[in-house]
Structure formats: structure tokens, C-alpha cells
UniProtKB/Swiss-Prot annotation:
PANTHER family: 60S RIBOSOMAL PROTEIN L29 (PTHR12884:SF0). This is Large ribosomal subunit protein eL29. The gene is RPL29. GO terms for cellular component: cytosolic large ribosomal subunit. It holds the Pfam family Ribosomal_L29e. Residues 1-66 are annotated as: Disordered. Transmembrane segments: none annotated. It comes from Tetrahymena thermophila. GO terms for molecular function: structural constituent of ribosome. InterPro entries: Ribosomal_eL29 (IPR002673). The lineage of its organism: Eukaryota, Sar, Alveolata, Ciliophora, Intramacronucleata. Residues 1-14 have a biased composition (Polar residues).
Amino acid sequence: MAKSKNSTNKNQISKSHRNGIKKPKDHRHISTKGVNPRFLRNRRRAIKNDPSIKKSKNLEKKVNKE
């Protein structure tokens, strides 16, 4: 039987670096596509009625004005 070829890594590094290895771009908002609608409704209402979140948003507005 003929020997099977072992894997080779030749030229792979230069190919990947030719256009640069880039980090994946961070998106501002994570997609909610495919997420349970009941969870999304509950999340929206929780954010709306949570006083700690409102405090942090008000602080951000004050800091941005100054």
C-alpha cells in the first residue's frame, strides 16, 4: 500500500496575511432575530420599568450635556 500524505501547512500563513488578519467587527446592537418573542416582550417591559436603568440613562444624559 502507498503511504498516505500527511497534512501540509505550506503557504497558508502568507495567504492569510496577504490581506491582513482582521478582527470581527463589533456591532452596536446584537441581533434579536430568532429570539423567543415572549422573552423580548418581557425584556422590553423590564427595561422600561427598572429604576436602576433609568438612573444610569439619566446620568449619561447629564454627563453628555456638560
